A protein has these predicted regions:
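Short, low-complexity disordered leader/linker segments with a strong preference
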Residues: 1-41, 72, 395-396
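Beta-alpha junction/loop-to-helix N-cap segments that form part of ligand/metal-binding clefts
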Residues: 28-32, 54-58, 76-151, 219-224
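Hydrophobic alpha-helical segments within soluble ligand-binding/sensing domains
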Residues: 99, 162-187, 199-201, 225-227, ...
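Extracytoplasmic ligand/sensor domains, especially the bilobed periplasmic-binding protein
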Residues: 112-215, 263-290
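Extracellular/periplasmic periplasmic-binding protein-like sensory domains
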Residues: 254-329, 389-396
């Protein structure tokens, strides 16, 4: 007798069948995953403190705004019955080990039917085994590593999704923009080599930049003195400095680069999309700065949803919406659409609904989920002048 080897996807489905929890259901989905009762519980496994706390707080704001909006309108339509959403927030403290334990708590104790977060690739990766084991999908609003949704053999993790484009798309788009719009022929790269985020985006920029990369330097997250490496870079003839990293180091690098007399444009990725970066760099140094992102209020004319969303966000939180809040806001509505498409709030059905998302109309643009659970969507580039967003470019 021949024994067929089970695929990763099928194995995950079988594995999680023993973890059924929640309300009784007559659907086949009741044999696995978690089921919603009168309230749809969505877990939020988020970096609310620690190194990535700035991103996590943004995402919490976006999630709560979406939940409040949906509940005010009566809730989610689950096969003709309206059910309200309850967001259950857990702080993973920007720690991979805590992210993993929070994932277990949310799925096995809180009995959530879907999870949003973690925000970062490393923390999100730590939760993947739990998602596949318990059949509770998680949607990261901002993880960017190219292979985030895939296992080591290139197979799709069935219960892992993201609402943000891959990091290599940021790198390639930045390379194109630098060459075609900024007219840069020579680029220098200063990247964070302590995370998949920085390494992956830097690699893509280097691969797709049509000019010459004259220098590539690396640093570790937590470094505070970049004067030596910036002096070395300054000695090279370059037209743009590319810095794919998180806001803490980006802010310090911008400050020290300008103080060292580097006047060329500085580009980065979505890690720059936090007001804390400008507080670190100083507004006077944050001019001719560009970064790739999924959202900016500056492109409201190209998306009718942006203006009304930003007004609601500003009314609630007293400021314009940042990128990660918009991404997490869309994430809640993507889960809502998945539930309404499948006419079920069972976790397995939500997974199926997320995989089917097509032409989702969000504040971060139109989104279609591809076969590898990555979204297809346009990218935006923001320009900072004196620390303030001054212009937005939509790159398709």
């Amino acid at each position: 007798m021949k024994i067929k080897k089970m695929t990763g996807f099928a194995a995950a489905i079988m594995m999680c069948s023993a973890f059924m929890a929640g309300c009784t259901s007559k659907t086949s989905a009741a044999t696995k995953g978690n089921q919603a009762c009168d309230t749809i519980k969505i877990g939020v496994n988020m970096e609310l403190s620690g190194a990535a706390g700035g991103y996590g707080q943004q995402e919490k704001n976006g999630i709560q705004l979406a939940v409040d909006e949906i509940n005010t309108k009566g809730g989610v339509n689950v096969n003709g019955k309206k059910k309200k959403i309850k967001a259950i927030y857990r702080d993973n403290k920007s720690s991979t080990s805590t992210s993993a334990s929070v994932a277990t708590q949310l799925t096995t104790q809180d009995k959530v039917v879907a999870t949003i977060g973690p925000a970062t690739t490393n923390d999100g990766t730590a939760t993947i085994p739990t998602a596949n084991k318990t059949c509770v999908p998680f949607l990261s609003a901002s993880a960017t590593a190219p292979d985030f949704t895939l296992d080591k053999n290139g197979k799709v993790h069935p219960y892992v999704f993201r609402a943000y484009f891959k990091g290599d798309y940021q790198g390639s788009s930045a390379a194109k923009f630098a060459y075609e719009t900024l007219k840069a022929k020579r680029a220098a790269i200063l990247a964070d080599n302590s995370s998949d985020y920085g390494i992956g985006i830097a690699k893509a920029f280097k691969q797709y930049f049509k000019g010459t990369v004259v220098d590539t330097q690396y640093f570790q997250a937590g470094d505070k003195n970049f004067n030596s490496v910036l002096t070395s870079i300054k000695s090279k003839k370059f037209d743009v400095l590319y810095v794919p990293a998180y806001y803490t180091e980006c802010g310090t690098i911008i400050k020290q680069a300008r103080e060292a007399g580097i006047k060329q444009p500085i580009m980065g990725a979505d890690g720059m999309s936090d007001d804390k970066m400008v507080k670190i760099s100083g507004a006077e140094n944050a001019t001719d700065i560009y970064y790739t992102t999924a959202f900016t209020v500056l492109t409201a004319n190209s998306n009718p949803k942006v203006a009304s969303y930003n007004k609601a966000y500003k009314d609630k939180y007293g400021e314009d919406s940042p990128t990660f809040a918009a991404l997490s806001y869309d994430s809640v509505y993507m889960i809502k659409q998945a539930i309404e498409t499948e006419k079920s709030a069972d976790s397995v059905k939500i997974q199926q609904g997320l995989a089917k998302i097509k032409n989702f109309k969000g504040v971060t643009g139109d989104t279609t989920m591809d076969a590898k659970h990555n979204p297809k969507k346009a990218i935006t580039i923001v320009k900072l002048e004196n620390g303030k967003p001054s212009k937005g470019y939509v790159v398709k």
